[in-house]
Amino acid sequence: MTKPRHYLQFKDFTRDDYRHVFDRTRWIKDKFKRYEPYHPLFDRTLVMIFEKASTRTRLSFEAGMQQLGGSAIYLNTRDSQLGRGEPVEDAAQVISRMSDVVMIRTFEQDIIERFAAHSRVPVINGLTNEYHPCQILADIYTFIEHRGSIQGRTVAWVGDSNNMCNTWLQAAELLDFNVHVSTPPGYEVEPERAGLYGTGHFEQFADPMEACKGADLVTTDVWTSMGFEAENDERMKDFADWCVDAEMMAAARADAVFMHCLPAHRGEEVTADVIDGAQSVVWDEAENRLHVQKALMEYLVLGKVED
């Protein structure tokens, strides 16, 4: 049996892989906009395992698999044996014998790595505490749609050094662009983690305005991610000066775009005039989760497909 290919971190793909996935995304999205059916995964099954709740992840994967001609099954850990102590390795053996691709949205990266190691089919990281590769895949494709190649460009990350930030750093090293990160004191990218991504594409700033200077893309996320709710009150104080506003966007390039993976809290990590303004591409970004993930599933299940 051929060993399946997984998508657990952004660095799991090469630059050529991404070139193909982005090309396929463009083609698949065009078919979607023309209401032309495209069913390369007819009679295939996606199993979606959720330990963390979601709106966009479930909707984009479930709708995406149906649009590709397949079916999607939703499992959450509360209603399955995974939530009752069944070993991840055992669950992987069983689930992968009854499906063609698996998407997991969970807390610990170790869980998805262990599942993939015992799976007979491709496994996709729908989100973990450490990485969110599908979101960055959509973000980069959205940038390409609006501004062209991201190579050599600058992304300003303002806020928490969370899973989104980690994945941006991986993407920058692989696709040759720069990331400026600005976080409050105590929330910086840890030195040992920064070393994992190299230093040629990453710079850390104490001042968010400085991070945004000359940026082609300004992006942020909620201040309190799932699993950190106990820290919410403290984080609201610590991050108060890291709200992306019109002044920060003015420091960026005149044609810079704003992104947010959603859900957003207006008045916290971003002001309403920015997220609802002319430079914001958040709705295209959200829609593109659907299209890039269709291209991703096609690639993992079928390999390279040409027009």
Swiss-Prot record:
It comes from the Bacteria. GO terms for cellular component: cytoplasm. InterPro entries: Asp/Orn_carbamoyltranf_P-bd, Asp/Orn_carbamoylTrfase, Asp/Orn_carbamoylTrfase_sf, Asp_carbamoyltransf_Asp/Orn-bd, Orn/put_carbamltrans, OTCase_ArgI. Coiled coil: none annotated. GO terms for molecular function: amino acid binding; ornithine carbamoyltransferase activity. L-ornithine binds at residues 163, 221, 225-226. Belongs to the aspartate/ornithine carbamoyltransferase superfamily. OTCase family. One of its GO terms (biological process) is citrulline biosynthetic process. Its main location: cytoplasm. Keywords: Amino-acid biosynthesis, Arginine biosynthesis, Cytoplasm, Transferase. Reversibly catalyzes the transfer of the carbamoyl group from carbamoyl phosphate (CP) to the N(epsilon) atom of ornithine (ORN) to produce L-citrulline. It is found in: Cytoplasm. Carbamoyl phosphate binds at residues 54-57, 81, 105, 132-135, 261-262, 289. It comes from Aromatoleum aromaticum (strain DSM 19018 / LMG 30748 / EbN1). PROSITE patterns: CARBAMOYLTRANSFERASE. This is Ornithine carbamoyltransferase. SUPFAM superfamilies: Aspartate/ornithine carbamoyltransferase. It catalyses: carbamoyl phosphate + L-ornithine = L-citrulline + phosphate + H(+). Its EC number is 2.1.3.3. Pathway: Amino-acid biosynthesis; L-arginine biosynthesis; L-arginine from L-ornithine and carbamoyl phosphate: step 1/3. The keyword GTP-binding does not apply.
